[in-house]
Amino acid sequence: MASSREIGRRAGWVPRAAAAAIMVAATTAAPADAKTLRWAHSNDATTMDPYGAYIPVNASLLNNIYEPLVRYDRGYRFEASLATEWTRLAPDRWRLVLRRGVTFHDGNPFDSGDVVASLKRASDPNSPYRPATQMIKDVVAIDDHTIEIQLQGPYPTILNDLAGVYIMDRQWMEKNDTLRAVNPAKGEESFATRNANGTGPFRLTSRRPDVETVLEVNPAWWDKAEHNLERIVYRPLGADATRIAALLSGEVHLVTPAPVQDVDRIRRTPELKILEVADLKVALFGLNIGAAQLNDSDVKDRNPLADRRVRQALYQAIDREAITGRLLRGLTKPTHALIAAEIQGFDPVLDTAPAPFDPEAAKRLLAEAGYPDGFRIGFDCPTERFVNGEQMCQAVVAMWARIGVKAAYQSHPYAPYLKKVLNGQSDIYILGWANTPQLDAFSILNNVLHSKTPRSGTWNPGKYANAEVDALIDRAGSEVDPVARKALIVDAFRKVQADYAAIPLYREPLLYGARRTVETWAAPDSKIRLWLTRMN
């Protein structure tokens, strides 16, 4: 039996990510509206429904309105939120004691019925959040402030999953006919799409999609407020120049993200500052390994990527130092690991290069594989979602050309890009994986590196398959001993590295621009925690 106290001690498997996150002190006088934070982001949240879609912009806004049962502290260790205690009764069963005296923004009291209804809604087959709850077999309310969760089997990361599921108000859902989840990807909406009622530190008071969202402080919040904010005005400003102009003029106090090309300008402006941290998201290239034939290649009788030597050649031809030093202006560093150091399961050995940057060695590998003159191959990148992503992809095209690989580069808006990739129509593609909201290596292992099954390989359009890797991932998915589990995870990643099944590049740089009056935590999961934000 494991208690919350025991789990807290075991949380040493997570390095102190707080050392990488930054608290920036205020240095100038406060403006007249010191308690109103004006925040501009590059795009708008797609929905106010906490189970509508897990994308960073949604999570960054909604984590201030809704709360989970357990949350992460600044070191990415579990701490109490709407649950104050959690106990593992058996490898497949947990008991959670809920916080008393909590109310939703409309005044309804929080109790176990809300948790049962929320987990049922998140588990709905139509819910985009179903993957986070698929291991939950049943949830039972023992009393008003105690629940028990029965799992499908032994499962070590249920707390990680629960940390990403926000709790909704059962009475509010019943009243507004939104007990059943809707899927925005199918064009579906419900009352929860444009309205919200959580227990969090701020409540939604106004919502105009793609124009402005207004939050106001929740005076009845159960936790101790570290912020001094009364009101937040959130505006989507898509154009980089517009966003930075608003920051320079004082129209907004915080911009997320700050464009790489404007970092020096912001730093030179006395009233402004840059908050920077390495994102949890690792930028990597996915490879169409399992197809019989590539989509866009002059090799028609076989798939060059099916040969490990070809994959290694592509790996060794990339000058990561040049990419991070020049294109990304030294704001991040190369990585050879597929997960960030803050992610559960990371080991420093995973950031060891399986082979060095060596174009001449890459040419020899191609010749050994039967391609002394190289070959043509399709290569797709999105026009958005990655910092200087198009420039990086074009730089890699030039690097591969030096070894004879002619990458037929195409850039696409993100939506058609994603459709092409997931349909298996791309030979090489860029993917960013942050392992959120789970913050566990099982996320990328099971979703990206496991072969396709009903529960695995959702993001493996390249059809990479290794029976030994699959077996290790499956065992890690049910191993509850943390030491044994980490060994399985590291072993799986080492085999993936030896296969060159994916090509990690770097952790994305996460950059915020702010007035010097703003003090906040630049967290590597890219969420703005308004309850940890002050204006001075």
Each model region followed by its residue ranges:
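Gly/Pro-rich hinge or "lid" segments in bacterial periplasmic/extracellular proteins
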Residues: 77, 165-227, 231-233, 360, ...
